[in-house]
UniProtKB/Swiss-Prot annotation:
Subcellular localization: Cytoplasm
Domain Pyruvate carboxyltransferase: 5-268
Subunit structure: Homodimer.
Organism: Cupriavidus pinatubonensis (strain JMP 134 / LMG 1197)
Catalysis performed (reactions): 3-methyl-2-oxobutanoate + acetyl-CoA + H2O = (2S)-2-isopropylmalate + CoA + H(+)
Catalytic activity, EC: 2.3.3.13
Protein name: 2-isopropylmalate synthase
A cellular-component GO term for this protein: cytosol
């Protein structure tokens, strides 16, 4: 059995299914490039047949990412598989991941197919996919609740047809570590051709055991691929956290005896990027990437760490990408210094025009606050990345008036399809007034389901990062805006969310694996 653990990242596919986490093509490309710097083995870039937007995003990622295998999900039918293969064609290395449900409940209620029909369709799907690539992954949806005899029959059949990775998902997060490991081991032992495939796990965190289940399946069940997401992003309670399984295997190599190719110094930058793009703030006590992950409040612990770090730290903060929150630039810093710092932070901008736009925003910010931190620079880049030629709404300016005892009044100027619009509104507070001002011109009909504010750095000069979540006609999107002025950040976030609602290239089919 191999001593290499394959890391399969599905942030861009399964992670995006978290309500409000939908991303634009440009945002997906930025995350894919960071995943490449992280050196994940496989990037599941999306589900090509779900929408034109997902197809184009996968194709764009396949064109720019060269060092990771690019994967697309596909249902077990020729149309989906051909669509996936077409999207993946530009990739240096690609995988088709096809699936069909195998539990009695899913076959009867959802697919309305007999077991024999499912068996045949699974085999034919893998056979068809082999026309395009030798790298085929098969998942029996709801596999952990499937009849063991039937599950083994299906998996033996798809391996015979050429499936090279078999992924056994815990679709509803019901499994427990020992039982899940037993399932993987039992299936492998019962299938005569099991040695011809890599065995993979895909766990959901509904009972808080996704990481534990994945690691148990690796150590006790013989799995050699873990499907995971940055920050554990995903629908319901999320997926297996990439950062946690990677650091568990790295830190406890004495126990797992496995090698992982991930560049762990890129973990925190990846976490911050996904958080900034999706608007999903990482909880402070989150393992590895939380703000308090390496903080010690106890006097005894602090004393121990000062004397010898390994008294209370089992891994080093710098090994996962945490750096000191130092001042890097100021208002007198030039364009070359700014560009150099972007490179040090692992930020790649596509053109000099993008560098110039980001530098212009940096100079504006430097006039407002004396100390510019790395987090400020990352926020600037994220803000600028939201702007593209197809942008429907774009913030220009804001003025507001608020006196004690009077309802606040706001005036917002913004572009809508290239035309400048000015809206005015009143509300219970300055933010409420600002959003009413925007709606006076937009009339979106959207419902706000979340509004949150986060300080990017410490101090009263810190930029505010606002996340707005809107819902309309069954679609839920997030918008993120940053500015030293919280009200302006709110306007930017609201317009960013409206842009995503306006974008028709949104995933329509969201399968659970």
């Amino acid at each position: 059995m191999s001593d290499k653990l394959i890391i399969f990242d599905t942030t861009l596919r399964d992670g995006e299914q978290s309500p409000g986490a939908s991303m634009t093509r440009e945002e997906k490309i930025r995350i894919a490039k960071q995943l490449e710097r992280l050196k994940v083995d496989v990037i599941e870039a999306g589900f090509a047949a779900s929408s034109n937007g997902d197809y184009e995003a996968i194709r764009s990622i396949a064109q720019v990412v060269k060092d990771s295998t690019i994967c697309s999900l596909a249902r077990a039918n020729d149309k989906d598989i051909a669509r996936a293969a077409e999207a993946l064609k530009p990739a240096n290395s690609f995988r088709i991941h096809t699936f069909i449900a195998t539990s009695a409940l899913h076959m009867e209620k959802k697919l309305r197919m007999t077991p024999d029909q499912v068996y045949e369709q699974a085999r034919l799907a893998v056979r068809f996919a082999r026309q395009f690539t030798d790298d085929i992954e098969f998942s029996p949806e709801d596999g952990s609740r499937s009849d063991m005899d039937f599950l083994c029959r299906v998996l033996e059949g798809v391996i015979a047809e050429g499936a090279t990775t078999i992924n056994l998902p815990d679709t509803v997060g019901y499994a427990v570590p020992e039982g899940y490991a037993d399932l993987i081991r039992s299936v492998r032992e019962r299938i005569p051709n099991s040695d011809k495939a890599v065995w993979s796990v895909h766990c959901h965190n509904d009972l808080g055991m996704a990481v534990a289940n994945s690691l148990a399946a690796v150590k006790l069940g013989g799995a050699r691929q873990i499907e995971c997401t940055i920050n554990g992003l995903g629908e319901r309670a999320g997926n297996t956290s990439l950062e946690e399984v990677v650091m568990a295997v790295k830190t406890r190599r004495d126990y797992f005896n496995l090698d992982v190719g991930v560049d762990t110094s890129q973990i925190v930058p990846a976490s911050k990027l996904v958080s900034q793009i999706t608007g999903f703030v990482v909880q402070p006590n989150k393992a590895v990437v939380g703000a308090n992950a390496f903080a010690h409040a106890s006097g005894i612990h602090q004393d121990g760490v000062l004397k010898a770090r390994d008294t209370y730290e089992i891994m080093r903060a710098e090994d996962v990408g945490w750096t000191a929150n130092k001042i890097v630039l100021g208002k007198l810093s030039g364009r070359n210094a700014f560009k150099q710092r972007l490179q040090e932070l692992g930020v790649e901008l596509e053109s000099e025009a993008e560098v110039n736009a980001a530098f212009g925003r940096f100079k504006e910010l430097a006039d407002q606050k004396a100390e510019i931190f790395d987090e400020d620079i990352m926020a600037i880049v994220s803000n600028e990345a939201q702007h593209d030629a197809n942008e429907h709404y774009r913030f220009i300016s804001l003025s507001q008036r608020s006196e004690t005892g009077e309802r606040p009044h706001a005036r917002v100027v913004f572009n809508m399809d290239g035309q400048e619009h000015s809206g005015e509104g009143e509300g219970n507070g300055p933010v409420d007034a600002t959003l009413h001002a925007i709606e006076s011109q937009v009339n979106s009909g959207a419902e706000m389901v979340l509004y949150s504010v986060n300080a990017i750095t410490g101090g009263t000069e810190a930029q505010g990062e606002v996340t707005v979540r809107l819902s309309k006609a069954g679609r839920i999107v997030n918008g993120v805006g940053t500015d030293p002025d919280i009200v302006a950040a709110s306007a930017k976030a609201y317009l960013a969310a409206l842009n995503k609602l306006h974008d028709k290239a949104v995933q329509k089919i969201n399968p659970q694996i």
